[in-house]
Amino acid sequence: MQLEVSDLFFSYDETDVLKSVSFCADRGERIAVLGPNGVGKSTLFRCLLGFLEPKRGSVKIAGRDVRDYSRRALAAELAYIPQSYSPAFDHTVLDSVLMGLSAQLGTFDRPSRAQAVRAMQILSELGIAQLAERGCTRISGGERQLMLLGRALMQNAHTLIMDEPTASLDYGNSFRVM
């Protein structure tokens, strides 16, 4: 799978945020997008995910425009960890990780026992299995960031897009994530 961004432009009102952004990324390749606050990194990620429509240019996965993907097909290709997350409901950490399957299963389908076991394995690997039954509004910012990583891993997409994934993490967890 190749992610290809070509001559991407995006503006908020009349303010250009992205100007002629182009790059390619192959499966397994790690790319860091660096820059000061407000430069457009999150906007770029939203364009990659098809959340925002660029003014000009294209985003393609394996030669196909992201706008041509169904939600389910795009979820198989891209998983996203936002830089901040304010949960609207107090789902458990385990349920929040299992939500990584919602694009594949459908909103109201229940995960299988094997999927729940896999979610617990992911929480264990991230060092937060003890939080599985805790409400996600009652965990720290760093624990919430690890939960979001778990959700993205549960999604099992080909490409992981992380927007400041270590901002809330301590040094040890930051090192493990990267």
Predicted segments, located by residue:
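Conserved structural motif at the start of ABC-family nucleotide-binding domains
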Residues: 3-5, 18-20
